[in-house]
């Protein structure tokens, strides 16, 4: 009777095959605990992996940002290099044009030089801008000489002086030669003007007596002509003498004085 009292009764919901022991329940609970622990470990590993992935993503993002910044800087440098290349190209074109222009000028100069050398008229003078004509070029002026002396000494005097000073001072000898030739031209113009004035002054004198002759005397032009001939004789030497200071005859000489100052 005691054994029947100790036996457990039927568990509600238990299989009808037999009673469930406590050992099986414990083993099941242990298995469940081990499974939960493994799940937790897996979740922790997944969390760690997720954190590593997040860090790698951040690093990738930072690398992409640095790459974008470097790309911007490279694009800016490329733009600057392109602008510099364009400027250099424009400068190179301008330099090439200048070189072509200078080459053309050099060719023209060489052609002109060849022509001058072929003609034998090449004269090279080295001078300063503010050079003065020496004073001795103005000392011996042919103004005080007479017309006959000038005709005799005119062509010889410049050649002698040029021959003496051509070896030492070529620039001064040329200035002297130019000065003396200018003075000779001025003197020739003076002589031409004086001869013209003498002829113009001699013409009215023989004309006036025949006009007055018939009014005063009715004897004829035979007596008027000899009276006009002695009047011409004193006039001709006066044409060779220095010109009288008359106001009407000084006006043509004014350009002659200007020619002397310019020479």
Curated annotation (Swiss-Prot):
Biased composition (Low complexity): 219-234
Database matches in InterPro entries: Cavin_fam
Per UniProt, location of the Glycyl lysine isopeptide (Lys-Gly) (interchain with G-Cter in SUMO2) cross-link in this chain: 128
Biased composition (Acidic residues): 157-170
Keyword terms of this UniProt record: Biological rhythms, Cytoplasm, Isopeptide bond, Membrane, Phosphoprotein, Tumor suppressor, Ubl conjugation
UniProt-annotated location(s): Cytoplasm; Membrane, Caveola; Cytoplasm, Cytosol
Single GO BP term: positive regulation of ERK1 and ERK2 cascade
Entries under Pfam families matching the protein: PTRF_SDPR
Domain of life: Eukaryota
Purpose: Regulates the traffic and/or budding of caveolae. Plays a role in caveola formation in a tissue-specific manner. Required for the formation of caveolae in smooth muscle but not in the lung and heart endothelial cells. Regulates the equilibrium between cell surface-associated and cell surface-dissociated caveolae by promoting the rapid release of caveolae from the cell surface. Plays a role in the regulation of the circadian clock. Modulates the period length and phase of circadian gene expression and also regulates expression and interaction of the core clock components PER1/2 and CRY1/2.
UniProt subunit comment: Component of the CAVIN complex composed of CAVIN1, CAVIN2, CAVIN3 and CAVIN4. Interacts with PRKCD and with phosphatidylserine. Phosphatidylserine may form a bridge between PKC and PKC-binding partners and stabilize the binding. Interacts with PER2. Interacts with CAVIN1 and EPS15L1. Interacts (via leucine-zipper domain) with CAV1 in a cholesterol-sensitive manner.
Family recorded in the similarity comment: Belongs to the CAVIN family.
Name listed for the protein in its UniProt record: Caveolae-associated protein 3
Gene symbol of the encoding locus: Cavin3
């Amino acid at each position: 009777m005691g054994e029947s009292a100790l036996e457990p009764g039927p568990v509600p919901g238990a299989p009808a095959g037999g009673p469930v022991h406590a050992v099986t329940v414990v083993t099941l609970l242990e298995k469940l605990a081990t499974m939960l622990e493994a799940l937790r470990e897996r979740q922790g590993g997944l969390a760690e992996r997720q954190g590593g992935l997040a860090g790698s993503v951040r690093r990738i993002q930072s690398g992409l940002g640095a790459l974008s910044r470097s790309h911007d800087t490279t694009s800016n440098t490329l733009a600057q290099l392109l602008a510099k290349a364009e400027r250099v190209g424009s400068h190179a074109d301008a330099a090439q044009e200048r070189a072509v222009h200078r080459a053309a000028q050099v060719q023209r100069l060489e052609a002109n030089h060849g022509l001058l050398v072929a003609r034998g008229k090449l004269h090279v003078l080295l001078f300063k801008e503010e050079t003065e004509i020496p004073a001795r070029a103005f000392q011996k002026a042919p103004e005080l000489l007479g017309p006959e002396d000038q005709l005799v000494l005119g062509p010889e005097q410049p050649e002698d002086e040029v021959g003496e000073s051509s070896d030492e001072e070529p620039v001064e000898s040329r200035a002297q030669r130019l000065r003396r030739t200018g003075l000779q031209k001025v003197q020739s113009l003076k002589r031409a003007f004086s001869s013209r004035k003498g002829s113009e002054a001699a013409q009215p004198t023989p004309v006036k007596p025949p006009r007055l002759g018939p009014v005063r005397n009715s004897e004829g032009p035979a007596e008027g002509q000899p009276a006009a001939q002695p009047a011409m004789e004193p006039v001709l030497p006066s044409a060779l003498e220095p010109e009288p200071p008359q106001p009407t005859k000084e006006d043509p000489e004014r350009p002659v004085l200007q020619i002397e100052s310019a020479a």
